[in-house]
Curated annotation (Swiss-Prot):
Residues 1-20 have a biased composition (Basic residues). One of its GO terms (molecular function) is structural constituent of ribosome. InterPro entries: Ribosomal_uL16, Ribosomal_uL16_bact-type, Ribosomal_uL16_CS, Ribosomal_uL16_dom, Ribosomal_uL16_sf. CDD domains: Ribosomal_L16_L10e. It comes from Blochmanniella pennsylvanica (strain BPEN). This is Large ribosomal subunit protein uL16. Keywords: Ribonucleoprotein, Ribosomal protein, RNA-binding, rRNA-binding, tRNA-binding. One of its GO terms (cellular component) is cytosolic large ribosomal subunit. The lineage of its organism: Bacteria, Pseudomonadati, Pseudomonadota, Gammaproteobacteria, Enterobacterales. Residues 1-21 are annotated as: Disordered. The gene is rplP.
Length: 134
């Protein structure tokens, strides 16, 4: 179940810059959360891999919320194609992550189990993270 938008106004986007920080991004749904402390881009497959690792670690008890959604298309030109001739095709989708962004939330599990689950999930992600609680 790779995440991507159902439909967008435009197929391709400018690269843009990933600056700024998320100020006061609090826990909304769960009791414990995985919070990013560095910036980066999360692919939809990385978001799914971390979700699977977390749900397996908590043995499907409790509830998980995914607080990020990959809404930015990343394009790539085919191998051995000369420069020019337009922008490449959409290869995958990413979510831009700033420091302070809440990535996942969990409810209904003990603190130790949540910590271990988030540790397994964080190992699948390319950004540095920390565990926070209410």
């Amino acid at each position: 179940m790779l995440l991507q938008p159902k439909r967008t106004k435009f197929r391709k986007m400018h690269k843009g810059r990933n600056r700024g920080t998320k100020v006061n991004d609090n826990i909304s749904f769960g009791q414990f959360a995985l919070k990013a402390i560095s910036r980066g881009r999360l692919k939809s497959c990385q978001i799914e891999a971390a979700r699977r690792a977390i749900s397996r670690a908590i043995k499907r008890q409790g509830k998980i919320w995914i607080r990020v959604f990959p809404d930015k298309p990343i394009t790539k030109k085919p191998l051995e194609v000369r420069m020019g001739k337009g922008k490449g095709n959409v290869e995958y989708w990413v979510a831009l992550i700033q420091p302070g962004k809440i990535l996942y939330e969990i409810n209904g599990v003990p603190k130790e189990l949540a910590y271990n689950a988030f540790k397994l999930g964080a190992s699948k992600l390319p950004v540095k993270t920390t565990l926070i609680g209410r």
